[in-house]
Structures are given as C-alpha cells and as structure tokens.
Swiss-Prot record:
The chain crosses the membrane at residues 27-47, 98-118, 129-149, 165-185, 203-223, 248-268, 269-289, 297-317, 340-360. It is found in: Plastid, Chloroplast thylakoid membrane. The keyword Chloroplast applies. This is NAD(P)H-quinone oxidoreductase subunit 1, chloroplastic. It comes from Nasturtium officinale (Watercress). One of its GO terms (cellular component) is chloroplast thylakoid membrane. NDH shuttles electrons from NAD(P)H:plastoquinone, via FMN and iron-sulfur (Fe-S) centers, to quinones in the photosynthetic chain and possibly in a chloroplast respiratory chain. The immediate electron acceptor for the enzyme in this species is believed to be plastoquinone. Couples the redox reaction to proton translocation, and thus conserves the redox energy in a proton gradient.
Length: 360
C-alpha cells in the first residue's frame, strides 16, 4: 500500500507539473501579444498629442496644456469621455451592420501589426508572405466603413462609405505595385528579409535611393489609405457632415477615431520597414546584428528606438501635410489614383523587373 500511495503521489505531482507547464505556455503566448497591444495604444496616444501640438504650432495658437504636463493626457481624457457617452442607434438603420462596421475597421488594422519587425528578431509573426498579408488584411477595413455607412440609413453616411471604398480601391493598386518592386529588390516577401537586405551599406543601402519614384507613390497612396487631408473625402465636413461617422456616438465613434490613428501608425511603420532600413543604424558596415550578438537587450532597445525615430519622422510629415494642404475634389482624387499613380507605379515595376533580370 505504501508503494501504491507513493506511485499515486508521483503521478499526481507529474500531472500538476504538466498542467503548470501548459498554463505557463499559454501565458507566454499572450505576453508578446499584450506587449504589442500596449505599445500600439501608447503610440496612438503619443500621435494624438503630437498632432495637437504640431497643428497648434502651424496655426500659431496654444495647444492642449491642462490635461497632464504639456497636455500629454488630453487624448486619454477624450477617450474616457467617449467611453461614458451614450451609444445611439439610428431608428431605421441596420443594427448588425451598424455595430460590426467599426469593429471590422479596427481589428483588420490591428492584425497588420503582427508582421512589423520592431528590432532584430522582435516580430510577432515572421511570415514568408508578411508584406502581402498586410495588404490583404488592410483591404478589409474599407468593407467595415461601407457596412457602417449602409447600416446607418443616412444619405451622408452612405455616400461617405461609398467614397471610402472607391478611394481604397483607387490607391490600393499603386501601393501594391510599389510593394512588389521592393520585394523584387529584396527577393523576399518577408518584412524581416526586406529590412536585412538594406543593412549592408547603412544610409546608402536604403530602398529610398533605389526606389525614389516608388517611395513618393507609396507616400501618397498611404496618406490616401489613411483618409487624411488632402484625401479625407469620405468624411468631408463641408459636404458630408462626418461621412460614415455621422450617426455614431460614444465608444463606436471612438473606435473610428482610433482606427484612423492606427492606420496612420501602421503606414508610417511600413514606410520605415520598406524604404528607410527598419531597425538598422544608418552607418555603413555597422549593423544592429553585431550589437545584438554582444548584448541582446541593448541591441533590441537600440533597434526599437531607431525604428520609432524613423516612424515618427514620417508621422511629422503626415501631420504637417494634413494641416497645410487643401482637400482635393472627388474627381481630382480618382484621376490622381487611376491616371497618374497607377501608370507610373506600373512603369516603375517594369523597370525594376528589367534591372533585376539584366543583373542576373
């Protein structure tokens, strides 16, 4: 009996140990996801504060200054206010579409962050088709906007949803062609491989110098995808009140607000990854990989800092563009996408393909 009891205790302790391993395994799965979401939320709050400060400087006025030091908690205060506001529903709208639309817009953009390499080996999902996964997922967001516009049963909302879909289709194609040119130069669709392909010559190894036309087209197309001035036709205040957001209030309106800045941040991160060398130091023959091999924590920290510095540089350009340029007309926006950016990006892809073939 003593031997039997000892065997039972051994088995029970083994089962408990295996259960603890499974629990710890699940925890370690969610730790990087939670860290990424926390970092994204912090980044969005910083962007909102930066936009308020930069716009105040451009317009020669005082920005937010009461909510926290230098007004840095103003975005948090706005989010809290929206959280406690009443959620109104249009009486004759389509409740399922009206409720699901904002969630689709936010979730589709959030999933795109999984393929962003913030530093060496610091990426949630290093996929062989990472760059195409971003394009595929980001094309889902306009469907949510169209659902929101249709489900609101409002002519302004519906027109805003249609404009969002038309604008996304018009600028998604030139953006995809620019991404194809980059993947041809790097011989890979992985975001990590694209960054590493730019690491050899430092500043001069960036794809910005090898693809200047593609960079400009990608810049314009990404701003149009973010629906920011001068491309904010889907929510033009003078024409459509607030576009597809007209009937929304409370937390659902806040989701659209967050989705706009999430889209701006992911576009800036992809500009950094595709054209500005990602996490690499802009000094020839000095790579983050060398620092990472010496000290992993120090190398990772430096890589994150460099990635975010390049990202926020592009964000400054995007914010300054919003507050300095006038809005385009709808016909001008579509003509720019279909008659100019699409042929130029296609020609750029053909030139890149030709150079790659001749260099073999």
């Amino acid at each position: 009996m003593i031997i039997y009891a000892t065997a039972v205790q051994t088995i029970n302790s083994f089962v408990r140990l295996e259960s603890l391993k499974e629990v710890y395994g699940l925890i370690w799965i969610f730790v990087p996801i939670f860290s990424l979401v926390l970092g994204i939320i912090t980044g969005v709050l910083v962007i909102v504060w930066l936009e308020r400060e930069i716009s105040a400087g451009i317009q020669q006025r005082i920005g937010p200054e009461y909510a926290g030091p230098l007004g840095i908690l103003q975005a948090l205060a706005d989010g809290t206010k929206l959280l406690f506001k009443e959620n109104l529903r249009p009486s004759r709208g389509n409740p399922p579409l009206f409720s699901i639309g904002p969630s689709i817009a936010v979730i589709s953009i959030l999933l795109s962050y999984s393929v962003i390499p913030f530093s060496n080996h610091l990426v949630l999902a290093d996929l062989n088709i990472g760059i195409f996964l971003w394009i595929a997922i980001s094309s889902i967001a306009p469907i949510g906007l169209l659902m929101s516009g249709y489900g609101s049963n409002n002519k302004y909302s519906f027109l805003g949803g249609l404009r969002a879909a038309a604008q996304s289709i018009s600028y998604e194609i030139p953006l995809t062609l620019c991404v194809l040119s980059i993947s041809l130069l790097s011989n890979s669709l992985s975001t990590v491989d694209i960054v590493e392909a730019q690491s050899k010559y430092g500043f001069w190894g960036w794809n910005l110098w090898r693809q200047p036309i593609g960079f400009i087209i990608f810049l314009i197309s990404s701003l149009a995808e973010c629906e920011r001035l001068p491309f904010d036709l889907p929510e033009a205040e003078e024409e459509l009140i607030a576009g597809y957001q007209t009937e929304y209030s409370g937390i659902k309106f806040g989701l659209f607000y967050v989705a706009s800045y999430l889209n701006l941040l992911i576009s800036s991160l992809f500009v950094t990854v595709l054209y500005l060398g990602g996490w690499n130091i802009s000094i020839p023959y000095i790579s983050i990989l060398e620092l990472f091999q010496r000290d992993q924590i120090f190398g990772t920290t430096i890589g994150i800092f460099i990635t975010l510095a390049k990202t926020y540089l592009f964000l400054f350009i995007s914010i300054a563009t919003r507050w300095t340029l006038p809005r385009l007309r709808m016909d001008q926006l579509l003509n720019l996408g279909w008659k100019f950016l699409l042929p130029i990006s296609l020609g750029n892809l053909l030139l890149t393909t030709s150079f790659q073939l001749f260099s073999l």
